[in-house]
Structures are given as structure tokens and as C-alpha cells.
């Protein structure tokens, strides 16, 4: 089952319709985290690097075999984490391009009803960025200035959470 990025996030961001379970590596998440997501990687950075090298040299089948071998010792703990994250509220699995890692996490978590995102993180990012420009164009910038101690920070704290911000 697949979910479109625009069905997960409203234009220009906001609370996702489902809780994203981000199975990208920690390094990938560090370069761009998803709003409201819980990061539970299927591969750590070293494992991802090893799989990527094999993929480039030997192809997908060999890379999948390496991925299975390097993740086997951690699989039980990762499965339990994905299951716990998918319990209690509607969730969706997300990887880089919406392919093998999110499909594998869904299968291994024994949650076939939990969708994955079409196009993964890349498609979500594109969707959010496309919605950002029109959203910003509809707003009037407001600049807060003043000398030190004039209450600028207090004002910002009082306005925190205001729908216009």
C-alpha cells in the first residue's frame, strides 16, 4: 500500500496525517529530518555505506544479500522498535526514495496495513518545498527591532504558537 506525499503532509508543512517512521540511516536523517517523524533506521551509516558499495560494484541482488547479513544481528530489536512506533496511531514508513527499505521495514514489522510513501523522503521534500513558496507569498513579513532589553524575546515567546506565525 502506497501513500502520496500530499496525502501525508498539507501544503507548506504542518502536522502529518500519519506518524512517519523514517527508516533512513542516521546520516541521511541528519541532512534532512521530516516534521513529526520518528527515526528508526533499517541500516546504520556504516551498514548503508557497505551496501551501497556492493550495489555500485555488483548490483542489487548482491547488495540485498549484504544488507541481510549486516542487519541480521540487529533485526529483532529494529523490528520491535518499528512495531512499537506503528502501534497506537496511524503510521507510514518512509525511506529515501520510497523503495526497498520502507517496504522491507513494513514487511519485517508485520504491519502490512501500514503504507509506505510514494517517492519517499525526496518526494515529501519536493512537495513541502513546492508548497512553501506560495505560502510565504501570502504572508507579510514583520520585523521586530529594538535595543537590548526592550522585550523582543518576551514578545516572541508570547506570540509562539500564534496561527499567523
Question: How would you label these PLM feature ranges?
Answer:
Residues 1-115, 131-138, 142-154, 160-165:
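Cytosolic catalytic domains that perform sulfur/thiol-centered chemistry
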Amino acid at each position: 500500500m502506497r501513500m502520496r506525499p500530499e496525502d501525508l503532509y498539507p501544503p507548506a508543512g504542518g502536522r502529518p496525517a500519519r506518524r512517519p517512521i523514517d527508516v533512513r540511516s542516521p546520516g541521511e536523517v541528519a541532512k534532512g529530518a521530516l516534521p513529526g517523524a520518528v527515526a528508526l533506521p533499517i541500516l546504520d551509516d556504516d551498514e548503508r555505506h557497505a551496501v551501497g558499495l556492493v550495489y555500485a560494484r555488483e548490483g542489487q541482488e548482491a547488495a540485498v544479500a549484504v544488507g541481510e547479513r549486516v542487519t541480521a544481528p540487529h533485526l529483532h530489536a529494529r523490528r520491535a522498535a518499528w512495531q512499537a512506533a506503528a502501534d497506537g496511531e496511524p503510521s507510514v514508513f518512509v525511506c529515501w526514495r520510497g523503495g526497498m527499505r520502507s517496504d522491507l521495514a513494513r514487511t519485517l514489522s508485520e504491519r502490512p496495513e501500514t503504507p509506505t510513501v510514494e517517492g519517499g523522503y525526496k518526494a515529501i521534500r519536493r512537495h513541502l518545498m513546492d508548497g512553501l513558496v506560495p505560502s510565504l507569498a501570502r504572508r507579510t513579513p514583520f520585523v521586530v527591532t529594538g535595543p537590548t532589553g526592550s522585550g523582543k524575546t518576551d514578545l516572541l515567546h508570547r506570540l509562539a504558537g500564534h496561527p499567523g506565525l
